[in-house]
Curated annotation (Swiss-Prot):
It comes from Arabidopsis thaliana. It is found in: Golgi apparatus membrane; Cell membrane. CDD domains: SEC14. This is Phosphatidylinositol/phosphatidylcholine transfer protein SFH6. Belongs to the SFH family. The keyword Nucleotidyltransferase does not apply. InterPro entries: CRAL-TRIO_dom, CRAL-TRIO_dom_sf, CRAL/TRIO_N_dom, CRAL/TRIO_N_dom_sf, PI/PC_transfer. Required for transport of secretory proteins from the Golgi complex. Catalyzes the transfer of phosphatidylinositol and phosphatidylcholine between membranes in vitro. Residues 519-576 form a coiled coil. The gene is SFH6.
Length: 614
């Protein structure tokens, strides 16, 4: 026999064992093997149960801590043209190594593009200057490094600050410029310290105020509403130090924090200010002027259209007094003062909350819609990987898939982080990049991977779905499924790239040549008209250049004669002035002589009267 019994049979030196003894020993051995397998199986079950309980305990703890975060859904509306521009801008920054992880944000890049009217080269130059300025100024650590102890004195001579939010959830910033005393302000602080304080407050807004408003309003917010009270503003407010401060602050804000103003209301503006504004308005960009509203003394109704009465200070026509906090200008009232919201912000609630991303076309219609569970999913984080099973459905209209199959959403807090050395399904799509857009699957029409393939390829550290076996005997099956999913991912990636390349190379539809032909004709007509005007301009310049640079002889003679005539007139004027002066002097002398004669005659009359009386 060649079975396991023969291998484990005990050799007998006394002779050949009988068949009964062999059967008895065989049955004893089989019983011991069954017992050993039973014990091993029970140990495996206990180990698996213990591991499962441990994982579930971790999941429960994380769910308890994230219960508030997961309940917040933030709406993020994006325009498809802006989306494409930001994606192109992001790729340019990545190629130039100008995109730190901290600033890899869709809305931040969009603000810089808007500031440069979507000129990518100008926006890239502006972005590079901003990165360099942050390094030189120490902006990344200014909140921890800089302490502004004189803030109370500064607020006394320069009343300003945030107070609550408008009806759309944006923070409201108020300045009472008429109460500013620049001289006393510069006595309690310095220009450089105030500028550092200003930058610190801007950084605090992006770290606390804007995220808190985002959570409270349940939509993305990165701009504010400003109210400037110019009552009493005069030349005394615009000293040299004040002008220098305003110039430096405007440069810092415009260069490094662009497009953070949603709208501005200038109230208590007098007739002179409004006349000046109507003149200055013609030199500004129409988009900028549309944000600025100059109001007179009857501004209350306009402000109440934007801000609720309970959120507007009493001195601006609202009902809020903040009496228990020293007044509205000192209260710093807003969602950023809510302990629950602040706790969520400090624990990354604004970044880890569910984001509802809507992509709109030029007509304002939703063409793509996605609800990523958590923006950041780390492959090595068990608790965050758990959220992958909670991902909500993604809906894309057929029209959007047909028209925008090449569109890719740039990662904006909705990315899957793939750790080095980890096997991840999402990681196969971007081996060159650490972050993979989660929404690309919703917009890309070539995404054909079945849900079962996704569910069978969990990343490292992620919990297994219920349909995946967890016992030891299914290990080979899991390895096979993971390998198949990996291969499918690679094939899908290459098919996506090839489809995009083919899409770009496909000939346009039949109606496209007509459109392109008309556009080309219009461009040709425009070019011809420009060339014609340019030719006329060159002819005029040539005619001007052909004229002699010296003055003609006749005109020069006339000019000399005019100069001589002016000289003669000046001489005559001098002589006339001299004669007039002499005449005046003669007149004074005559008047004095007449006065003397009158006095003499008066004395003679008095003497005659006296003699007659005697």
């Amino acid at each position: 026999m060649s079975g396991p019994v023969d291998r484990f049979a005990i050799p007998c030196f006394e002779g050949i064992l009988s068949s009964d003894e062999k059967k008895e020993r065989k049955s004893d051995f089989e019983n011991s093997e069954d017992e050993r397998r039973t014990r091993i199986g029970s140990l495996k079950k206990k180990a698996i149960n213990a591991s499962t309980k441990f994982k579930h305990s971790l999941k429960k703890k994380r769910r308890k801590s994230d219960v508030r975060v997961s309940s917040v859904s933030i709406e993020d509306v994006r325009d498809v043209e802006e989306l494409q521009a930001v994606d192109e801008f992001r790729q340019a920054l990545v190629m130039e190594e100008l995109l730190p992880h901290k600033h890899d944000d869709y809305h931040m890049m969009l603000r810089f593009l808007k500031a440069r009217k979507f000129d990518i080269e100008k926006a890239k130059h502006m972005w590079a200057d901003m990165i360099q300025w942050r390094k030189e100024f120490g902006t990344d650590t200014i909140i921890q490094d800089f302490q502004f102890e004189e803030i109370d004195e500064v607020l006394k001579y320069y009343p300003h600050g945030y107070h609550s939010v408008d009806k759309e959830g944006r923070p409201v910033y108020i300045e009472r410029l008429g109460k500013v005393d620049p001289n006393k302000l510069m006595q309690v602080t310095t220009l450089d310290r105030y500028i550092r304080y200003h930058v610190k407050e801007f950084e605090r807004s992006f770290m606390l105020k804007f995220p808190a408003c985002t959570i409270a309003a349940k939509k993305y917010i990165d701009s504010s509403t400003t109210i400037l009270d110019v009552q009493g503003v005069g030349l005394k407010n615009f000293t040299k130090s004040a002008r220098e401060l305003i110039t430096r602050l405007q440069k810092i804000d415009g260069d490094n924090y662009p497009e953070t103003l949603h709208q501005m209301f200038i109230i208590n503006a007098g007739p002179g200010f409004r006349l000046l504004w109507s003149t200055v308005k013609s030199f500004l960009d129409p988009k900028t002027t549309s944000k600025i509203h100059v109001l007179g003394c009857k501004y209350q109704s306009k402000l109440l259209e934007i801000i609720d009465s309970s959120e507007l200070p009493e001195f601006l026509g609202g009902a809020c007094t903040c009496a228990d906090q020293g007044g509205c200008m000192l209260s710093d009232k807003g969602p950023w003062k809510n302990p629950e919201i602040v706790k969520m912000v400090l624990h990354g609630g604004a970044h880890r909350a569910k984001q509802v991303v809507k992509v709109l076309n030029s007509d304002g219609k939703v063409i793509a819609y996605a609800k990523p569970s958590y923006p950041w999913i780390k492959g090595s984080d068990t608790s965050t990987a758990e959220s992958g099973s909670e991902a909500e459905d993604i809906v894309v209209s057929p029209k959007a898939v047909k028209s925008y199959s090449h569109l890719r959403l740039t990662p904006v807090r909705e990315e899957a982080k793939v750790g080095s050395g980890e096997t991840s399904f999402a990681g196969s799509f971007a081996g060159y990049d650490e972050y993979v857009p989660m929404v690309d699957k919703a917009v890309d029409a070539t995404w054909k991977v079945k849900p079962t393939a996704i569910n069978r390829a969990p990343s490292k550290g992620a919990h297994m779905p219920p349909n995946v076996p967890k016992d030891h005997e299914s290990f080979s099956a899991r390895v096979l499924v993971t390998f198949m999913a990996f291969v499918m991912a690679i094939l899908t990636f290459f098919r996506t790239v090839s489809n995009r390349v083919v899409t770009k190379q496909l000939p346009p539809p039949p109606s496209q040549p007509q459109i392109e032909g008309s556009a080309a004709a219009e461009e040709a007509d425009l070019l011809n008209s420009v060339l014609k005007k340019l030719t006329e301009l060159e002819e005029k310049i040539g005619a001007l250049q052909s004229k002699p640079s010296e003055m003609p002889y006749e005109k020069e003679e006339l000019l000399n004669a005019a100069v001589c005539r002016v000289d003669a007139l000046e001489a005559e004027l001098i002589a006339t002035k001299k004669a007039l002066y002499e005449a005046l002097m003669r007149q004074e002398e005559l008047l004095a002589y007449i006065d003397r004669q009158e006095a003499a005659q008066h004395q003679k009359k008095n003497k005659r009267k006296q003699m007659f009386c005697f």
